[in-house]
From Swiss-Prot:
Enzyme Commission identifier(s): 2.3.1.129
Record-level GO BP terms: lipid A biosynthetic process
InterPro entries given in the database record: Acetyltransf_C, Acetyltransf_C_sf, Hexapep, Lipid_A_LpxA, Trimer_LpxA-like_sf
Family statement drawn from the similarity comment of this UniProt entry: Belongs to the transferase hexapeptide repeat family. LpxA subfamily.
Gene Ontology CC entries for this record: cytoplasm; membrane
GO molecular function, one term: acyl-[acyl-carrier-protein]-UDP-N-acetylglucosamine O-acyltransferase activity
Protein name as catalogued: Acyl-[acyl-carrier-protein]--UDP-N-acetylglucosamine O-acyltransferase
Catalytic activity: a (3R)-hydroxyacyl-[ACP] + UDP-N-acetyl-alpha-D-glucosamine = a UDP-3-O-[(3R)-3-hydroxyacyl]-N-acetyl-alpha-D-glucosamine + holo-[ACP]
Amino acid sequence: MIHETAQIHPSAVIEGDVTIEANVSVGPFSYISGNVTIGEGTEVMSHVVIKGDTIIGKDNRIFSFAIIGEESQDKKYGGEATKVVVGDRNFIRESVQIHRGTVQDRGVTTVGNDNLLCVNVHIAHDCIVGSNIIMGNNATLAGHVTIEDYAIVSALSPVHQFCTVGAHSFIGGASVVVQDVPPFVMAQGNHCKPFGINIEGLKRRGFEKPEIHAIRRAYKALYRNGNTLEEAKEEIKTEIEAFPVLQGFLDLFEKSTRGIIR
């Protein structure tokens, strides 16, 4: 179904069970095929490919040569019915690739709301990308990666399979992330190492001074006081009631399978 207010360029190809909602525009030579839904107000520019079982929300801007919903680059993938779900108000720049999930995981790759995915960003199968995230040019996520809200992954930085990049963290340019990055932490290098707290980012997002000081103490417990990980956990737990924002540290410690950058 194509809504009467949608604007489809004559050279665009649309086939299969495609739903295009109100005020969507589709540019020249774009190809949309399969069980695809494109939400109201989304702009699809020229030469975009959207395939498979893919849901795209409202008011997104999808730039030329982006590919969304292609099969995963996982050799175990055997054509199963898996999907991509993209939220609202994302900027998906030129040549971004977002691949479908696999049945070995959740079967879906998800991107939240209000993200900026810069040129040549790659989001592999089964990734969970939250909201208000920035990924710089050529940043790449291997399969099963989680990027939490407000994180920044700078240009040319790859993230290893099954890693988590915590909320409000900052990954410097050309870094290689092979273990989990706790929330609020700045990290850089090959392999990625911690370099303090993302203070400027926290200030911009309205964190109060007492919260920032508590986050600093948690960072010191983890990295500066000579603690084991278990000792750091216990030290952070003593402040959870007063500063619930620290719960993100404990949540990451519990679910980590790759280990924490140290």
